[in-house]
Amino acid sequence: MYFNNELSGLKDRFLKSLLAQKYPDRINFFLWELKFLDCFLHLQNFAFASECGMLDVSQKMLKNFKRMCATFRSIRPNAGSDNAFAYLKEVICKRLCATLLNTRPDACSDDGFAYWNEVIWKTKQEFRAKYSFPKTPLASNKVDDDDINIHSPKFVMEFIDAVVGNLNVLVKINDPCSLLFVPGPKEQIDQVSKELKLLRFFVCFVSNKCIEPQYGHTTFYIHALIEASHIAMVVWLHLPVYGNGNQDLAPSEVSRLLSDFISRNSNYIDVLKALKSTIPQAQNKHAAESGIVETPTHNLMVGLSDQMVNLQEMLCLLRDNLIHLPILDLEFHLQDMDSVILDAGLLIYSLYDIEGEKEDTVLDDMNRALGFDLPRNIEPIKVMVYLVMQKAFQCNLPRVHGLGYVDFLLKNLNDFQGRYSDSLAFLKNQLQVIQTEFESLQPFLKVVIEEPHNKLKTLNEDCATQIIRKAYEVEYVVDACINKVAPHWCLERWLLDIIEEITCIKAKIQEKNTVEDTMKTVITHTSSQLARTPRMNEEIVGFKDVIENLRNRLLNGTKGQDVISIHGMPGLGKTTLANRLYSDRSVVSHFDICAQCCVSQVYSYKELLLALLCDAVGDDSARRKHNENKLADKLRKTLLSRRYLILVDDVWDNSAWDDLRGCFPDANNRSRIILTTRHHEVAKYASVHSDPLHLRMFDEDESWKLLEKKVFGEKRCSSLLLKDVGLRIAKMCGQLPLSIVLVAGILSEMEKEVECWEQVANNLGTHIHNDSRAIVNQSYHVLPCHLKSCFLYFGAFLEDEVIDISRLIRLWISESFIKSSEGRRLEDIAEGYLENLIGRNLVMVTQRADSDGKVKACRLHDVLLDFCKERAAEENFLLWINRDQISTKAVYSHKQHAHLAFTEMDNLVEWSASCSLVGSVLFKNPDSYLYSPAFSTSLILLNFKFLKVLDLEHQVVIDFIPTELFYLRYLSASIEQNSIPSSISNLWNLETLILKSTPVGRHNTLLLPSTIWDMVKLRHLHIPKFSPENEEALLENSARLYDLETISTPYFSSVEDAELILRKTPNLRKLICEVECLEYPPQYHVLNFPIRLEILKLYRSKAFKTIPFCISAPNLKYLKLSGFYLDSQYLSETVDHLKHLEVLKLCDLEFGDHREWKVSNGMFPQLKILKLEYLSLMKWIVADDAFPNLEQLVLHGCQDLMEIPSCFMDILSLKYIEVDMSNKSVVKSAKNIEETQVEDNQNTNFKLVIIKKMVLKFDIYQNHDKGRLETFKKLVPLPGVKSVRFDMDEKKVTVTGVMDANEVQLVVSKLRKRGML
């Protein structure tokens, strides 16, 4: 308590010492005794202790300490020390512990503990015989000057905290072998602890209300101190000690402790009456107020049960909702609240003064005894309870909302009233009125989105925000009613107030519309006035001299390894510049291996190694099982004999570079490393030969060119007046590329008029020079309200994280950020939102689909990400809970609605009880899997009862699916089980279900219960290798899932299985599945897929080769077939049913018909992309009129193919051919096609890419033991070898690499020497 730092330091030293291995329990017990003595001896330093008749332990302990010093010769107290507290601190806590710590565990080190315990035990025996409860000093006694500190409420509260902490350990120890184990009545000890906490709250409450305490308050503080010390003394005297058996606290002693508390309630009443005359002081928190209305069950009388139950219910609600309620939300009710709390306290403690308490006490007797009317006195409490409960909920709502929340509420209100009609019966009329009101407001919310530049934008958005806040309140009221967490009178009143407030909002909107009708203008673009900014590729603008300088360093210079360090402030374009060089064809062709990783401020060393290995030798899921040392060694050996180019982006400190530098060997072969960092020190530290490059700012010409390109695309600014303003704006951006790009995003959304641009220039002002955050803030300010939540949500992602767009959009929809629009899919609307953010240069595109150009992945610049995190926290929208976070959960209320992002499971455990109303839990950690058997993850999640999004990113393994969270709309996690419980249908709001198997259960088929088909709101189902548990039940009893759009990966064992699921999902758009059919019809069966299906990926299972059905999907655009046996007839019959196919990928296929594929005239009329990978195809015959719209042809690993058909020379739409790991004749035919396309057809957009790789395949039908497989793995370090892939089903080994003839010969000779060939 008073030297906690010393005790904590001792504990750490003990636990780190060898003694902890042998005597852990004795160490804890030893420290426990020291804590108690700390309390007693410090207290008895003050004169008031003897006046109160408190038992004096100091003299007795002083004699013991001195005797102990004589026994342990190594202990030497300071001269003249004659104080027990000083001895405890100096001699026992330092010198005795040092003696024990310096003793070897195998020596007789137990003597120190045993001797100490024996001395204390004998002392306790003497004290127990004499101890009695101390008396309270007379009020007339003068306070000793030396005791002035002991009367401060802070001292009293610290003392009580120390005693409570000591008591709590007794309750928590459940191991019977522990020296601190108490086998007796722990419930009574726990109750005493609660009583002490109440006393502390009372002390805190009194001190908060009185800045200058009166003498009566000082007496009360002393009274509280005596009671706490009495409890501590009784418990200490009966504490179990080593060697003397377990001595628990006697029940009679516990009863006396409680009776002592109750008999002194008159003191509480006197203080409360005195406080009635004080003026309440404004507090930042209401913790003391919430504590003062705490009402343990034994505080209320058995009689008058109905009245007492109502009172207790209201006081509990008041307590729960007062905690951390901001004072600003109750500043006008502060005096009323104080009065209610004081009256409640007087009411509770007055009950103890009624003599002859009996169960048959009646209300009139109670009122006469108390001197007031109990029902009438309860009424103000009721009013305050409602007010506090409402304010506590409202003040924690996020200030940025998704406009789709009303859609979600309206759907749920119908479901709730159907499922919980009995619970909601008394609210039925109010809920119907609310539904009608919200439905009438839907057109207004649609206008807010479709006309974001309306002159009344601010008023519109304010009204929209109020509407969404009312929707949150309705949801909470309905849930509180169903779960009975608030009284009916409170909820009914709340709904009536909501109806009244919605009426006021509608009146404001109506008034606004009347004004708007007379001034219907739009200050910026409309759809007919403004052409959207053209989409451009990420071509770099400026830095031409820098690029040439860096390119020269990469290709020339020293023969040894060199690190090219680029450093500069955020927003200069370091990453863009480095990526430009990394993807430069003239640079890439100079190196054997290219690999990259992004470090960031927080990183996982293992993930960095895996990323580099993936680029260097190809992806291999088995690598994740290896530890960091093995991965680092693998990377080093891979790079050892190659000339490599490594891009290490965003390094924050020297230690991160130290982690990686050992993996990059210097073979004196001109290998290069590009490193980007914000810090000059890091760049200088990493440099080897070349000096670090400090990236300069843009010059004025570059600044304008970048602004012009981002606003006008490939066109130029034709207006000189507009250009003058643009030049001024570019100059105001401080020559910082990021700032220029952000401002360009603002300008691109406006009319290209001088007046509009002048307005932007004026708003930017001069203060934004070199201040990118100011420009980000401006870009955020002009965002329409429906985009603000989408943008701030990026703050939930990690730094430099590449974000999958499909996942992002599903999260947005589940968070209700997307407002529905009749006739449009939510996913399409969300894509429009994303494109808007991209058009404003707030989001960077990292990958687009080849076929339609849609965004597949994106990321945020670090500056923008930091802004999102900070602004989201300010708006109570998103909170990051980090391991090193200074603030604790106590800062935030349990009424918190914000989305929470966690980085550690321990954080989730700690916060779970404090965030019952949180809507989203997002787990972010750079490591792979996290699973702790010490606690049940799913049980912890049940505390988040309003959870709508649970995204654990497949990193947290849950022990079971939390099926009680019926608000849940998005669930993503990993599981170890091989079946899903039928109770999953309780998640009736679930729209996205993503479950991933852990490495342990990855190869098992997961059984899906038939109840999954009752989840009619399901839109996306992603479970690895699942099959229906009961097909018959599925067919007969289940409904169709009309909303289900994507499924992966069902396991079809028969054509009938496939037909069954396809009939149940009529609106399916994407299907990824495995197929196994041991029996199939002799003639191809036509399988009719859903008419809306656009993407289909079919994989074969181990036991099957031929596809037993033709695919009929009239609107299919993307088809991938992998691992099957095919022939020309099958492809011809299938293509007849796929008239709209745009992308075809054929992978790992065996071709029949003499390994020949014939493509007839008119086949694949809409095909744009054709990818052929690892086919056994030898001869490819294509008619002249086939593939009329083909744009891309990619051949990977087609080593047996003789040539690309010459008809590809005449396909005018062809833009790109890529050849990888194919023979020379294929390369030659590709070059012939290039020559014809470019020279004869004048197709300047045509591009040919030839990747010079070689693939060697070896059969391992015999002698494929583990040792021989290891021999193949050892081929990787050889020159030119990139990867070795095993297919144990086919009993083949594939060796891939950039190998010439000599290198291939080296591989073969190595295998021959090992006896493998």
Curated annotation (Swiss-Prot):
Coiled-coil blocks: 419-442, 535-556
Principal subcellular localisation of the protein: cytoplasm
MF-aspect GO terms: ADP binding; ATP binding; metal ion binding
Any one annotated GO CC term: membrane
Keyword hit for Translocase: no
Residues annotated as domain NB-ARC: 521-823
Domain HMA: 1251-1317
Residues given in the record as ATP binding sites: G568, M569, P570, G571, L572, G573, K574, T575
LRR repeat boundaries on the chain: 944-968, 987-1015, 1090-1114, 1138-1161, 1164-1186, 1187-1211
Keyword Phosphoprotein annotated: no
Topology within the bilayer: Peripheral membrane protein
Pfam families tied to this protein: NB-ARC, NB-LRR, WH_DRP
Position of the signal peptide: none
InterPro entries per the UniProt record, alphabetical: Apaf_helical, Disease_R_plants, HMA_dom, LRR_dom_sf, NB-ARC, P-loop_NTPase, R1A-like_N, RX-like_CC
Subcellular location(s) per record: Cytoplasm; Membrane
The entry's keywords: ATP-binding, Coiled coil, Cytoplasm, Hypersensitive response, Leucine-rich repeat, Membrane, Nucleotide-binding, Plant defense, Repeat
GO aspect biological process, one term: plant-type hypersensitive response
Family indicated by similarity: Belongs to the disease resistance NB-LRR family.
Anything else known: This protein is encoded by the haplotype B genome of the allohexaploid Solanum demissum.
Function noted in UniProt: Confers resistance to late blight (Phytophthora infestans) races carrying the avirulence gene Avr1. Resistance proteins guard the plant against pathogens that contain an appropriate avirulence protein via an indirect interaction with this avirulence protein. That triggers a defense system including the hypersensitive response, which restricts the pathogen growth.
Entries under PANTHER family matching the protein: AAA+ ATPASE DOMAIN-CONTAINING PROTEIN, DISEASE RESISTANCE PROTEIN RP
The name this protein goes by in its record: Putative late blight resistance protein homolog R1B-14
Organism, scientific name: Solanum demissum (Wild potato)
Record lineage: Eukaryota, Viridiplantae, Streptophyta, Embryophyta, Tracheophyta
